[in-house]
Design a protein with these regions (language model features):
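Mid-length scaffold segments of soluble, non-membrane domains
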Residues: 84-150
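Contiguous hydrophobic, core-forming segments of folded domains
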Residues: 33, 40-44, 48-49
Length: 209
């Protein structure tokens, strides 16, 4: 009788420790607080004169960007399949020009009970900072209603041989051309047009042109 009792006690302690560790490392606050700090930092950038995309008059009246509430269900792990032929796409830009991007891989995942797929891109003429990140321009059913009509972007850190990638739609952002027509931005290609709404990330800025 002693041994089973000890095993039960040990199992109980292990279970308590598991939930403690899970709560410590995976609770919402550990994710949401840094996300909100990032958003505040971006607001500061938009208010500043150096790196803000806003025209001077809009910048002087700027208060903050508008976002959906953080939603952990829209931070998804996707399976990555590198494309055997990584061809170059001349992605259309908002001014009618094109910019070269490498079709690097596809990411498959499930949202709202439906299978989804996005193509992950690398800019051909990329900077050192862009070397280990992938670019994901996409559209969804919120565009033109609650989010910028031209789509939104994700920048994703990525390791060369990774089999999965996290698509954190809470970090989806509007391109600079959503705030100022003087900027030129990529237009999300056909294969990245989602058939569902992604109510996460940056919303339409009411002070935009």
């Amino acid at each position: 009788m002693k041994r089973p009792l000890r095993l039960i006690i040990f199992a109980g302690i292990a279970l308590v420790l598991f939930y403690f560790v899970q709560e410590t490392f995976f609770n919402d606050d550990n994710y949401i607080k840094p996300l909100l700090q990032e958003r505040k930092a971006k607001d500061l950038t938009f208010r500043g004169r150096t790196n803000s995309p806003l025209p001077d008059e809009s910048r002087r009246n700027f208060k903050n960007l508008v976002y959906y509430e953080p939603n952990l269900d829209l931070r998804v792990k996707a399976k990555v399949a590198q494309l055997p032929k990584q061809d170059t796409l001349l992605m259309p830009m908002t001014n009618g020009s094109t910019e070269a991007y490498l079709r690097y891989a596809t990411a498959t995942f499930e949202l709202q009970g439906q299978p989804q797929r996005l193509t992950l891109y690398k800019k051909v003429n990329r900077t050192a900072d862009e070397e280990e990140q992938l670019f994901v321009p996409f559209t969804d059913k919120t565009n033109g209603f609650e989010t910028y009509g031209g789509g939104r972007f994700l920048d994703i850190p990525f390791e060369e041989d990774a089999e999965t990638v996290v698509l954190d739609f809470n970090r989806a952002y509007s391109p600079f051309c959503a705030f100022n027509p003087d900027y030129v931005c990529p237009v999300p290609p056909q294969d990245n047009r989602l058939s569902i709404a992604i109510p996460a990330g940056e919303k339409t800025y009411e002070g935009a042109h």
